[in-house]
Amino acid sequence: MDVYGLIGNPVGHSLSPPMHEAGYEALGLDARYVTFEPPADAGAEAIEAAETLGVDGLNVTIPFKQDVLDAVDPAPLAERIGAVNTVDFTGGTPTGYNTDAVGAVRALDHHDVSLSGTAVVVGAGGAGRAVAFGLADEGLSVRIANRTESKADALADEVPDASGHGLDSLSDLLANADILVNCTSVGMEEDKTPVPADALHSDLAVLDAVYTPIETRLLQDAAAAGATTVDGAWMLLYQGVEAFERWTGEDAPVDRMNGRLREHL
């Protein structure tokens, strides 16, 4: 039996177990997905313990995404982002990947969004870093808007063809943008949005990384403006799909995994 899992603290809320288990069931794989909740200062030790126990792959979530960098051989993208959310133990040395970046790209691609032009990323935290690098690697120009403009500037200095801005620049940035991705947690608060509704337009594709609630105020406003909308569960799904395919070497049964994920939202 192959064993995969998730380390984080806490992990009780995670939707990864049912999503991955649905994939194993659909393909008839002899595999299980389990959760581990080590102490908040023991991320690196947890990676070493998992390797000793013969775990085949791990997802990594808060607060360990940065802590485990020194315990794995990070892939180039994960190293640039400065965070690991997937570990593969099957190659002899634990290798760390960041599938959040790919998750955003594949979520947009699933909705037939053209990955070209200019993208505005709201938020310069962990999710914002991953999405900014992921979109830049697809060839988009990236405009990073953050409440603290200096943090947006610092991230833009690392990302190819990027610039940093304050949130007060959003309306101007979005006027000629093709893609908007919200990487802040603002949408989790009822009726809150980080983006002025009148800045949205029908030529935009809008992805909100928030998936609780599934239809945020931002997505409601975007739909009203005629924009293409992509909810955060698609990004969650595709970061998991990317890990699933890397671990198993199989094409993920995306529809089954998506169905199970949405049952648990």
Swiss-Prot record:
Any single biological process term in GO: shikimate metabolic process
Protein origin, superkingdom: Archaea
GO molecular function (one): NADP binding
Binding of NADP(+), residues: G123, A124, G125, G126, A127, N146, R147, T148, E149, S150, K151, A209, G232
Pathway: Metabolic intermediate biosynthesis; chorismate biosynthesis; chorismate from D-erythrose 4-phosphate and phosphoenolpyruvate: step 4/7
Active-site residues per Swiss-Prot or TrEMBL entry: K65 (proton acceptor)
Reaction(s) catalysed by this chain's protein: shikimate + NADP(+) = 3-dehydroshikimate + NADPH + H(+)
Keywords of the record: Amino-acid biosynthesis, Aromatic amino acid biosynthesis, NADP, Oxidoreductase
Xref: InterPro entries: Aminoacid_DH-like_N_sf, NAD(P)-bd_dom_sf, SDH_C, Shikimate_DH, Shikimate_DH-bd_N, Shikimate_DH_fam, Shikm_DH/Glu-tRNA_Rdtase
Annotated binding of shikimate, by residue: S14, L15, S16, T61, N85, D100, Y211
Gene3D superfamilies assigned: Leucine Dehydrogenase, chain A, domain 1, NAD(P)-binding Rossmann-like Domain
Pfam (any one): Shikimate_DH
Keyword NADP: yes
EC number: 1.1.1.25
Quaternary structure note: Homodimer.
Its job: Involved in the biosynthesis of the chorismate, which leads to the biosynthesis of aromatic amino acids. Catalyzes the reversible NADPH linked reduction of 3-dehydroshikimate (DHSA) to yield shikimate (SA).
Family: Belongs to the shikimate dehydrogenase family.
PANTHER family with a match to the protein in the record: BIFUNCTIONAL 3-DEHYDROQUINATE DEHYDRATASE_SHIKIMATE DEHYDROGENASE, CHLOROPLASTIC, SHIKIMATE DEHYDROGENASE
Name the record gives this protein: Shikimate dehydrogenase (NADP(+))
Gene that produces this protein: aroE
